[in-house]
Curated annotation (Swiss-Prot):
Function: Oxidative deamination of D-amino acids.
UniProt organism field: Brucella abortus (strain 2308)
Cofactor: FAD
Annotated GO MF terms: D-amino-acid dehydrogenase activity
Superkingdom of source: Bacteria
PANTHER family xrefs: D-AMINO ACID DEHYDROGENASE, SARCOSINE DEHYDROGENASE-RELATED
Keyword flag ATP-binding: no
Alphabetical list of NCBIfam families matching this protein: PRK00711.1
EC number: 1.4.99.-
Keywords per UniProt: FAD, Flavoprotein, Oxidoreductase
GO cellular component: cytoplasm; plasma membrane
Pathway: Amino-acid degradation; D-alanine degradation; NH(3) and pyruvate from D-alanine: step 1/1
Name of the protein in its database record: D-amino acid dehydrogenase
Amino acid sequence: MQITILGSGVIGVTTAYYLAKLGHEVTVIDREEGPALETSFANAGQVSPGYASPWAAPGIPLKAAKWLFQKHAPLILRLTTDPVQYRWLLQMLANCTDSRYKINKTRMVRVAEYSRDCLIELRKDTGIEYDQRSQGTLQLFREQYQLDGIGKDIEVLRQDGVPFEVLDRDGCVNVEPALAHAKDKFVGGLRLPNDETGDCFKFTNALAKIAEGLGVKFRFGVNIKSLLMSGGKISGVETSEGIVTAERYVVALGSYTPALIKALGLNAPIYPVKGYSITAPIVDESRAPVSTVLDESYKIAITRLGDRIRVGGMAEVSGFTDDLPAARRATLDLSVTDLFPGGDLKAATFWSGLRPMTPDSTPIIGGTRYDNLFINAGHGTLGWTMACGSGRLLADLISGNKADIRADDLGIARYN
């Protein structure tokens, strides 16, 4: 089939790759001049299936209220006049119950674990390189109450068969030796040994080249205006370079997905939650991380990417903004300097991206009420973690193949 994919972030490119592997003629359209130049550009770099947890969780409303008054808060709420923002926040609050948390986390872990397996297989098949490491993720707790409160997460990890280790200070230093100088800064950690790290931008660009070798065509610098309808199905895509037609269409536009499909009567409650990162060259190996360390207090991930340290995190609900406030940079600097001062922060680059978040934190993967329109969006902070599995899953659904994992609860129908 002829298939057009809208969006060349990591989700769009992985979808294109898997569709091409199944023999389809694929075209990818994006307004940028190359792949992964928006939200996929400089994320935290972690592939962490076990840490696939909903932002909407029991106790979060109270925590959020406290965070609003903290200088280095992991959550920043900047209210706008947009009613969509208020509606999304209310939907998120409705998911902050024990029952919804368990349902949403199980869905997320299912996709994330499958995706990690798909990534490993893809790596074996292609030999793709992207500063990859397979040395686990360490969630670091600065306070005892944080360590004492991981019971629910451990219960879900056990249920889903995800290996984990609860570590004391010495155990944390054993897996991340650079923490030896900061033993007074934390009390323990939770380690998931099967997690990975890697540069999402490098991966997406390398996979795009592999996909081109499979026949995928990329059209960059093309603005997407609207989806056209005829006879109850999508008949084309109106772009800045004319109308593009295909047999099937995939919308993988992250936070911009709702605006495109709204005219079709489809509701995708995806809202941009802004994240920040800095990337610094390593100047002292003895003070640099081995893999990814999650600073639980600040909700910040510190990741080793080759000869660089990537520090990413925070969640700012402020709409479609692209500013880079010095206060956000200060929080990133504080966390990494406290734990891993092996990077040259004076030479660091500062970046922000708009994570496409659903109120239940679960991505939208699947078809719509229009037979030839599909969506792969809303992965939030886990686009890199879930990319390969999401792309392969949707490729199977479009092709009419039996999916490897359950997919009936991942579609847009749960909102419409």
